[in-house]
């Protein structure tokens, strides 16, 4: 059975700096119509850095959760940006580490409602060169 849905009408409900929210009318494989709400996002890149069996994590406040959470270093891609370049930039800005990066996976974190893809890299041959946080970015680094 063909599982593809055919887009009939597409409408952008909101367009912001980081995301846009869309509402599409689609034709389902059985010929019936349905609506799909989804978020468009440029994607992200993240880096897994392991030193002596400990993973480097960043801890920062995330407004959507209203609490501090641990994450691997990551950031959003600029439009048409090479994910490896974004990963290297984010690793150095957030943690102060520079490394050789090896792509290990690309994942679809929430495919039910966004087109975001996150590219994950493994840091090898890393060295500390100094943290350079973006304006308005506040975080702490921890090996756990």
Q: What do these predicted ranges mean?
A:
Residues 1-5, 9-10, 17, 32, ...:
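Nudix hydrolase/Nudix homology domain
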Residues 6, 98-104:
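A short coil-to-beta-strand element that immediately follows conserved catalytic motifs
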Residues 23-29, 99, 111-130, 142:
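Active-site-adjacent beta-strand/loop module that shapes the phosphate/pyrophosphate-binding cleft
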Residues 5, 9-46, 51:
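Acidic, metal-coordinating catalytic segment for phosphate/diphosphate chemistry
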Residues 81-86, 94-100:
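Beta-rich strand-turn-strand
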Residues 10-12, 105-110:
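Short, solvent-exposed loop/turn elements at beta->coil junctions and helix N-caps
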Residues 2, 41, 45-89, 134-139:
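Conserved Nudix-box catalytic region and its N-terminal flanking loop in Nudix hydrolases
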